[in-house]
Amino acid sequence: MRIVDLYGQGRPIFSFEFFPPKTDAGENKLMETMADLKSAVEPDFVSVTYGAGGSTRDRTHGVVTRIQDELGITGMAHQTCVAASRADVLENVKRLVGSGVENVLALRGDPPETDGDWRPPSDGFSHANELLEFLTAEFDLSLGAACYPEVHPEAISAEDDLAWTRAKVESGAGFLRELLQ
């Protein structure tokens, strides 16, 4: 099911968010836990994070597809762009789509800590709205983006933050997920 279609049904949407475990044993334990949660609370979907530079990045695909295939729960994969080229993003999302994933949360992600200002790869994306434009042009997906009710920590002002949120919607986000700092 496309997550964007859940909204507007006049009922609360309930979901879980997990990071992919670093080991196969951890992944199997997560699947057992998710099976228990499914029978107890019937989540509408499960969101799986994507570590831009971390060791769990490559496991997002496996976890989200297992949640969908083995448990029958709608999955949403996070896709960050902070350290990714357009080719990297294209390859990863093609793989997700090929496995039946149709929901993606498009995020810039946290830049690595450096002594100077962070700069994206030369063939990458500076902001999530650029990632959303790219994904919208390449795929037919249910795309979400982050919003910050308490204002993004890098925003100049609340108005500036709202302008960035609007840019995400205008670039293809069909729904927003709130992030609190």
Kindly give the residue locations of the regions a language model identified:
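GNAT-family acyltransferases
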Residues: 17
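Acidic-and-aromatic substrate-binding clefts and catalytic sites of carbohydrate-active enzymes
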Residues: 25, 52-58, 82-87
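Short catalytic-loop micro-motif centered on adjacent basic/acidic residues
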Residues: 47-48, 75-79, 175-180
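Flexible loop residues that form catalytic
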Residues: 51, 109, 181
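N-terminal active-site wall of soluble small-molecule enzyme domains
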Residues: 58-70, 88
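Glycine-rich, N-terminal phosphate-binding loop and its surrounding beta-alpha-beta segment
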Residues: 67-82
